[in-house]
Amino acid sequence: MAGLLRRSLPLLVAALAWALVAVPAGACPFCSGQGQTLTDEVGTASMVIYGQLANANEGNETTDLKIEAVVKDHAYLRGKKVVTLSRYVPPAEGDQYRYLVFCDFFKEKLDPYRGLAVKKGSDMPAYLKGALELKDAKMEKKLKFFFQYLDNEDAEISNDAYKFFANTDYRDYRETFKSLPAAKVIKWLRAKDTPSFRYGLYASMLGHCGKPEDAKVLRAMLEDPEKKATSGVDGLLAGYVMLQPKEGWQYVRGILKDKSKEFLMRYAALRTVRFLWEYRPDLVAKKELAMGVAQLLSQDDIADLAVEDLRKWGVWDLTDRVLDLQKTEAYKTPIVRRSVLRFALSCPANKAAAAYVAEQRKKDPTAVRDAEELLKLEQSATPATPTGTGK
């Protein structure tokens, strides 16, 4: 039993790690913070009410809500201007806040299960009502609606609007982004109060709606020591390539080649190449993208990631370079050895790869079996993708 556990544990850990780093399907490639939006939450509630808290009674554990707006209606609310919540919620002093309350209705009783405090005068009711009205609308109309709220004064609203974009696949927003106001996007990118996690989204917006000369805005951000150390660098790089394909790609390739660049910068460049490979091979030929990634094979701290991408893309003409990693210091680390093994196992009809696998099977048959099982797991969870370098 102990032997079985020793065999299974590395496989389980590797499978879990693979699952954790997988990008959510249908999500913006340059965004973080995917998840349920307030609009989604409203959709699952029986009713959603907005108003002012009053008459909080600690003894009875009740609080009244004076209804100012009904975001999601229910028959229970008809004719009511005040509802009593079965929760003790002492309101803040003064008249600064209103409350958005999500409720279920069970056995003829109101069940408030979530409350959100928002500043008085907030656009929250109008925002949520507008979003609900667009539930069945075309994606273009939804995107333009949420775009208007990205700079809303209410952080709950602006962050929720951002989350809608974060949950949207690139293929669904690509065309709409072409008609966005570039001047407004540039203003957001330059604003000191713009959260760094939004740089990637805004840069990709500019990549579609901007002019070639707007690339200097993104280049300046990439050269800024403070901004290039934050999240969203892959989006800045991708936007640069969209606006100036030749110049932008040379910049990305230069980062990939430079071992002295910080790991996070080179990794951002690698993520940019992944985006270009999957979504925009019209900007840079796949053969060029593969050769750009191949530059990472000589860099010990990132070689394994390069091997994994080359394998997933089916770039078998670089098999010799991948197998040559056996001669490097990087190959002494288990993660690099595993990536080379997976590459060799996946490589079709290649004598050198087959010989490598045969040798490894003699040395460590358990490691080879585990690698084969992981590849089967990956194949069952991932749609088939074309192989080759797109020559």
Predicted regions and their residues:
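Bacterial N-terminal signal peptides
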Residues: P10-V23
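N-terminal secretory signal peptides that target proteins for export/translocation
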Residues: M1-R7
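Extended alpha-solenoid helical-repeat scaffolds
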Residues: R171-D172, V185-L189, S196, G200-T230, ...
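Amphipathic alpha-helical scaffolding segments comprising HEAT/armadillo-like alpha-solenoid repeats
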Residues: M139-F147, R171-W188, P212-E223, P245-K257, ...
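Structural detector for internal amphipathic alpha-helices that build alpha-solenoid repeat scaffolds
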Residues: L128-D136, N159-T176, F197-K211, S231-L243, ...
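Transition segments tied to proteolytic processing and entry into folded domains
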Residues: A22-E153, I157
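Eukaryotic acidic, Ser/Thr-rich intrinsically disordered low-complexity regions
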Residues: I335-K391
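Solenoid-like repeat scaffolds
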Residues: L150-D154, K187-T194, A220-A229, G254-L264, ...
